[in-house]
């Protein structure tokens, strides 16, 4: 492996607590972290250092599990084990909690904005996925409650350019949803993982979806539209999703997160074996049966489980990670020549 993942900086982001998740703002200038200390922290670069610009600690009563920025970068959503989601409005360096979304019966596990910024999705241990509509007055209204999963829903993510939503669950499946006649419907169920699906990531085109699981594999699913040249069967006008690649044998424990770089198409994983791994699609790889190579591996990236990896949306190769050890780390991925 000629490629390298170089540590740039390591910060104790959430002392005496797990650091659960990270999210870059769309400009790539700020990073939000959240943790078991009930806080959200905003990090910004000053020179070669990353410093804490703001601590948001008034919004939640329990662990903050996930954070997500709006596409405009002016709002931050935080999902908490207290069963609420807070919406924070950015005013220069300060953030104000302007709305608290309530309705889930149990812990909210994930939150994600649609690319338009007009829709927000949340999911929970109560097995449901909620879709919220945002109007011009920044009022949030639940427009659909989806009960397609049979267990705890771990993660939600939107397609990068369409209003297509994906969710991952403790029931070992991935589900996809779209709007149909003023309501949201489940339009596909992706089966194949043998245990909990922890996280999801679309590739830059939105034609492929990566899923990672407690079964220690990453699966790559490809979308096939009706009438596709490959002859993959579709139901009526619905697209079909097929697993075209399984990355197995690389991880020794649960894979908690997968991130697909929107600039380079590089995959990164966060694992319960304390490691970070980076995969590149092989040059000339068949799109219908793609192959990926492990190009970087940091065995002790953190001293405990790695919970999240996040590629910077503007700076190639800049990767952030966080862990049960409460730390946040910044890495520079340097691919070898020829990739």
UniProtKB/Swiss-Prot annotation:
Keywords assigned: Chromosome partition, Cytoplasm, Repeat, WD repeat
UniProt-listed Gene3D superfamilies: YVTN repeat-like/Quinoprotein amine dehydrogenase
Highest taxon above the source species: Eukaryota
WD repeat residue intervals: 14-53, 59-98, 103-142, 148-187, 192-231, 250-289, 301-339
Pfam families reported in the protein's UniProt record: WD40
Major location (coarse): cytoplasm
Location in the cell: Cytoplasm
PROSITE patterns: WD_REPEATS_1, WD_REPEATS_2, WD_REPEATS_REGION
GO biological process, one term: iron-sulfur cluster assembly
Motif LYR motif: positions: 176-178
One GO cellular component term: MMXD complex
Known function: Key component of the cytosolic iron-sulfur protein assembly (CIA) complex, a multiprotein complex that mediates the incorporation of iron-sulfur cluster into extramitochondrial Fe/S proteins. As a CIA complex component, interacts specifically with CIAO2A or CIAO2B and MMS19 to assist different branches of iron-sulfur protein assembly, depending of its interactors. The complex CIAO1:CIAO2B:MMS19 binds to and facilitates the assembly of most cytosolic-nuclear Fe/S proteins. CIAO1:CIAO2A specifically matures ACO1 and stabilizes IREB2.
Subunit-structure text: Component of the CIA complex. Interacts with CIAO2A and forms a complex with CIAO2B and MMS19; the interactions with CIAO2A and CIAO2B are mutually exclusive. Interacts with CHD1L, ERCC2, IREB2 and POLD1. Component of the MMXD complex, which includes CIAO1, ERCC2, CIAO2B, MMS19 and SLC25A5. Interacts with WT1. Interacts with CIAO3. Interacts (via LYR motif) with HSC20.
HAMAP family: ciao1
Family: Belongs to the WD repeat CIA1 family.
Protein name from the UniProt record: Probable cytosolic iron-sulfur protein assembly protein CIAO1
Organism: Bos taurus
């Amino acid at each position: 492996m000629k490629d390298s993942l170089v540590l740039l900086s390591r910060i104790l982001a959430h002392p005496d607590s797990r650091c659960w998740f990270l999210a870059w703002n769309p400009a790539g200038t700020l990073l939000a972290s959240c943790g078991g200390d009930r806080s959200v922290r905003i990090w910004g670069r000053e020179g070669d250092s990353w410093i804490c610009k703001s601590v948001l600690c008034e919004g939640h009563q329990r662990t903050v599990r996930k954070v997500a920025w709006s596409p405009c970068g002016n709002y931050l959503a935080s999902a908490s084990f207290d069963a609420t989601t807070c919406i924070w409005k950015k005013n220069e360096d300060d953030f104000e909690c302007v709305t608290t979304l309530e309705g889930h019966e149990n812990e909210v596990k994930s939150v994600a904005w649609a690319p338009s910024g007009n829709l927000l999705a949340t999911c929970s241990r109560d097995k449901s996925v909620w879709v919220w509509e945002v109007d011009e007055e920044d009022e949030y209204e639940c427009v659909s409650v989806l009960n397609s999963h049979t267990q705890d829903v771990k993660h939600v993510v939107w397609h990068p350019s369409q209003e297509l939503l994906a969710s991952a669950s403790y029931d070992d499946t991935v589900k996809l949803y779209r709007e149909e006649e003023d309501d949201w419907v489940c339009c596909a169920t992706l089966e194949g993982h043998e245990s909990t699906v922890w996280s999801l990531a679309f590739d830059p085109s939105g034609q492929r979806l990566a899923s990672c699981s407690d079964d220690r594999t990453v699966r790559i699913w490809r979308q096939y539209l009706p009438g596709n040249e490959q002859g993959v069967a579709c139901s009526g006008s619905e697209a079909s999703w097929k697993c075209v690649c399984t990355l197995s044998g690389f991880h020794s424990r649960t894979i908690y997160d997968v991130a697909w770089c929107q600039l380079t198409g590089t995959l990164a994983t966060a694992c319960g074996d304390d490691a970070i791994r980076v995969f590149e699609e092989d040059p000339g790889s068949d799109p219908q049966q793609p192959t990926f190579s492990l190009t970087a591996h940091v065995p002790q990236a953190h001293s405990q489980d790695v919970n999240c990896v996040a590629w910077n949306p503007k700076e190639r190769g800049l990767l952030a990670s966080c862990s049960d050890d409460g730390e946040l780390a910044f890495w520079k991925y340097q691919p070898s020549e020829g990739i």
